[in-house]
């Protein structure tokens, strides 16, 4: 079941990317909020 392993790895990868994007967004929002 290579597909199952691949899809689980892929979803893990997507989760990591989403988390990083969220953190980046959070930081930039905080930065913008501090600037105003």
Swiss-Prot record:
GO terms for cellular component: extracellular region. Pfam families: Hormone_2. It is found in: Secreted. Its main location: secreted. The keyword Chaperone does not apply. Produced by the X-cells of the islets of pancreas. Gene3D superfamilies: 6.10.250.590. GO terms for molecular function: hormone activity. Promotes hydrolysis of glycogen and lipids, and raises the blood sugar level. Belongs to the glucagon family. This is Glucagon. It comes from Hydrolagus colliei.
């Amino acid at each position: 079941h290579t597909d199952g392993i691949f899809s689980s790895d892929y979803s893990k990868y997507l989760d990591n990317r989403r988390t990083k994007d969220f953190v980046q967004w959070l930081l930039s929002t905080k930065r913008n909020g501090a600037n105003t």
